[in-house]
């Protein structure tokens, strides 16, 4: 749409979007989705890498799939948020705040935007993403009297990452920028 300077209701664009969901790679990926809305194993779905719900949603977004145009994608997005999002908006590989890292939070927030998925819960996800980078309103990792704190994966502001020897992570920074 953007490359061709088309309006959202352009008939040719609408036809192309419909065809995206009924043929090609989008249809192939959707054919492997379980009826409950996940790929691979149930749950937060980071693993099996490149075959689980995380990777399927990212790929669908990059291929131009649209949650408004296909109820299966909306189902998968809802399933994912229900299993991977914590009470403070962290997107987690396991559903626990300790399994949150910038790269995954950024990739998934960007994927939801790419998929045109609109849900009030995403406000918390983007809020956590911004706060966790700046440190605003987020307690240090050792603080145990609040859940709005850094954990072992996302250990501090400025893209600090437990998987990157507690250093800033360029991979995570790029994914966060994609989301914003």
For the regions a protein language model found, what residue spans apply to each?
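Preference for long, amphipathic alpha-helical scaffolds in soluble/luminal domains
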Residues: 1-180
């Amino acid at each position: 749409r953007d490359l061709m300077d088309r309006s959202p209701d352009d008939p040719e664009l609408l036809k192309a979007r419909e065809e995206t969901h009924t043929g090609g790679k989008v249809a192939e990926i959707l054919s492997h989705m379980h009826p409950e809305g996940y790929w691979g194993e149930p749950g937060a779905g980071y693993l099996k890498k490149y075959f689980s719900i995380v990777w399927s949603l990212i790929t669908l977004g990059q291929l131009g799939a649209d949650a408004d145009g296909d109820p299966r994608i909306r189902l998968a997005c809802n399933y994912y948020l229900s299993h991977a999002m914590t009470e403070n908006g962290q997107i987690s590989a396991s559903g626990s705040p300790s399994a949150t890292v910038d790269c995954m939070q950024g990739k998934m927030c960007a994927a939801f935007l790419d998929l045109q998925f609109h849900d009030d819960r995403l406000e918390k996800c983007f809020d956590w993403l911004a706060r966790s980078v700046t440190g605003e309103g987020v307690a240090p990792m050792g603080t145990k009297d609040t859940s709005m704190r850094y954990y072992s994966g996302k250990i501090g502001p400025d893209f600090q990452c437990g998987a990157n020897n507690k250093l800033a992570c360029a991979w995570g920074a790029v994914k966060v920028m994609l989301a914003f």
